[in-house]
Amino acid sequence: MWPRVLLGEARVAVDGCRALLSRLAVHFSPPWTAVSCSPLRRSLHGTATRAFPLIPIVVEQTGRGERAYDIYSRLLRERIVCVMGPIDDSVASLVIAQLLFLQSESNKKPIHMYINSPGGVVTAGLAIYDTMQYILNPICTWCVGQAASMGSLLLAAGSPGMRHSLPNSRIMIHQPSGGARGQATDIAIQAEEIMKLKKQLYNIYAKHTKQSLQVIESAMERDRYMSPMEAQEFGILDKVLVHPPQDGEDEPELVQKETATAPTDPPAPTST
């Protein structure tokens, strides 16, 4: 008699736990598992999970009940884009998608891009850069931690007057590097491509820092590390902030966005 009663009570307890877990799953399941979730949110979670295995979940109270977001999706609602870690093709795809999405919502409201990156693939960084120049929104860049290599280029590419750094960040610029193997002709082709990218990057830095090409070439010949104040003097950023700016302090200058291109060789003289 007693074993049967205890077994029945255990089954009731198990059923109750299952029901409780089901209700919790409905309320607190991450939004990227929902059928109606957007591809952007699934992409955001997938890339963020590879970079950061533990993603905080934010639960909001709405008129329809509770809604859960991963922290990066919640920041995206506030028009904040995070560029964290090495810049590769997957990170570039994620950042570009967010920029285009925010422009589709409003092409006048500023976008805040927080950068903490050691750099990465040049072509991936240039894809983000071109998108920043392509969209109409003013882009406010923030350096937190470090902005090295391609990270410093993205920092400098923000809208004039809206490029910031926190006081203990580090900024580093240098020329592109790479390697090649194979036949001598293939190596020569790769070396020529790196030289073209080098000139292209010099032009971009010169455009956004207002420095001459000679100064840029000299500064980027080797790794050059800068404090935020030194980077401000160099022209990579505009302000070093300890506290968030007050309302109205970050009005961008209305300038025409132009894409910097690599210099072209002058045409060879023709003989007559």
From Swiss-Prot:
Disruption phenotype: Homozygous pups are born at about 60 % of the expected Mendelian rate, indicating decreased intrauterine survival. Mutant mice are smaller in size than wild-type littermates, show decreased motor activity, are completely deaf after 12 months and their lifespan is decreased relative to that of wild-type littermates. Both female and male mutant mice are completely infertile due to defects in germ cell development. GO terms for biological process: membrane protein proteolysis; protein quality control for misfolded or incompletely synthesized proteins; proteolysis involved in protein catabolic process. SUPFAM superfamilies: ClpP/crotonase (SSF52096). Its main location: mitochondrion. Residues 240-272 are annotated as: Disordered. Residues 1-52 form a transit peptide. GO terms for cellular component: endopeptidase Clp complex; mitochondrial matrix; mitochondrion. The keyword Zinc does not apply. Protease component of the ClpXP complex that cleaves peptides and various proteins in an ATP-dependent process. Has low peptidase activity in the absence of CLPX. The ClpXP complex can degrade CSN1S1, CSN2 and CSN3, as well as synthetic peptides (in vitro) and may be responsible for a fairly general and central housekeeping function rather than for the degradation of specific substrates. Cleaves PINK1 in the mitochondrion. Belongs to the peptidase S14 family. This is ATP-dependent Clp protease proteolytic subunit, mitochondrial. It comes from Mus musculus (Mouse). The lineage of its organism: Eukaryota, Metazoa, Chordata, Craniata, Vertebrata.
